[in-house]
């Protein structure tokens, strides 16, 4: 009880950082020191800390399409942010080079909204790019990694990074509930030392009580059990939604683009109607879908007739 009334260091309470390190070791194959882990109230807060740590003189590039909020946060922190187009393997390394970027913000395990899982060869290409200059880093947002429905999760880029070029970010908001604003990042050792040297005046934005509660939830095995239950639950929901779609459309009318991970997939209609018209007609039937083009930072010339299904 007394510990909960004591203000801990800015990175978060030791017990939670140790629990996270143990979880990452068993679940993601990552060997990290608890002192490399920084806990914060949401990934948005951590993105802001990263800009302060890495500097506003860098060019930050983000995936296009992708979460628009990420670029908005960088820009609000006075950092130059450029969208970089993706191909079928993920963000284009050649376009990152053309943008003269120093920081690449990516979601290689399960990209939103395309669902692309970056193959190993592209991951090594990104690491090679980062290793070409001392001021280059990869921010690996491990979005939705807990919810891989088949097989083992693909190891993160950090697990193959031998030169301290990857900053790993994840959150408990997706795996537990959005009202739990607890996220964390894993910094390379030299950046963690720099963080505590320059930014240790920041207080941890997560309450001590919540940190100790989550630490016990993880260390006593409840988090792993919860994830396993949720995988089964969402796996059943996924199959139910897929069965409904296949029962309503032929393969020519509607193609399902799915991935083994994440809580969404994409359907593509064989139609000449504008995406907006399709959205409006479906909404009249009580079905709310978003076209994938809503998530493009640079507006595409043509509609893709692809829509996101969340479940």
Residue ranges and their predicted role:
Residues 141-142:
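Walker B catalytic acidic pair
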Residues 7-135, 146, 152-160, 164-167, ...:
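Conserved core of the PLP fold type I
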Residues 232-242, 254-268, 278-280:
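Conserved glycine-rich beta-strand-loop-beta hairpin in the small C-terminal domain of fold type I
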Residues 159-194:
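Active-site PLP attachment segment
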Residues 2-6:
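Short, small-residue-biased leader/transition segments that mark boundaries at the very start
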Residues 192-210:
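Active-site C-terminal subdomain of aminotransferase-like
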Residues 196-199, 220-242:
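Structural signature of PLP-dependent enzymes
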Residues 187, 266-272, 289-311:
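Conserved PLP-binding active-site segment of the aspartate aminotransferase-like
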């Amino acid at each position: 009880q007394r510990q909960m009334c004591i203000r801990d260091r800015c990175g978060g309470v030791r017990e939670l950082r140790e629990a996270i390190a143990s979880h990452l070791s068993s679940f993601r194959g990552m060997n990290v020191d608890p002192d490399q882990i920084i806990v914060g109230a949401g990934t948005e807060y951590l993105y802001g800390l990263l800009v302060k740590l890495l500097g506003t003189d860098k060019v930050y590039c983000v995936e296009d399409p992708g979460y628009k909020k990420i670029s908005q946060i960088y820009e609000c922190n006075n950092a130059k942010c450029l969208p970089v187009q993706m191909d079928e393997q993920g963000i284009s390394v050649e376009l990152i080079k053309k943008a003269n970027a120093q920081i690449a913000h990516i979601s290689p395990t399960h990209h939103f909204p395309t669902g692309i899982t970056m193959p190993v060869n592209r991951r090594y290409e990104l690491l090679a790019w980062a290793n070409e200059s001392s001021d280059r880093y990869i921010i690996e947002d491990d979005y939705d990694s807990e919810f891989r429905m088949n097989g083992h999760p693909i190891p993160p880029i950090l697990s193959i990074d031998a030169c301290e070029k990857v900053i790993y970010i994840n959150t408990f908001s997706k795996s537990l509930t959005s009202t739990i604003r607890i996220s964390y990042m894993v910094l390379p050792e030299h950046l963690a030392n720099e963080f505590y040297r320059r930014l240790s005046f920041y207080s941890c934005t997560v309450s001590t009580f919540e940190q100790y509660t989550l630490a016990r939830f993880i260390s006593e095995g409840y988090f792993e059990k919860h994830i396993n239950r949720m995988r089964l639950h969402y796996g059943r929901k996924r199959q139910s939604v897929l069965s409904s779609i296949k029962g309503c459309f032929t393969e020519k009318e509607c193609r399902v683009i799915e991935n083994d991970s994440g809580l969404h997939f994409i359907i593509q209609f064989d139609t000449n109607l504008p995406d907006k018209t399709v959205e409006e007609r479906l909404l009249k039937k009580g079905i709310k879908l978003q076209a994938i083009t809503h998530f493009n930072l640079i507006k595409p010339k043509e509609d893709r007739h692809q829509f996101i299904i969340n479940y």
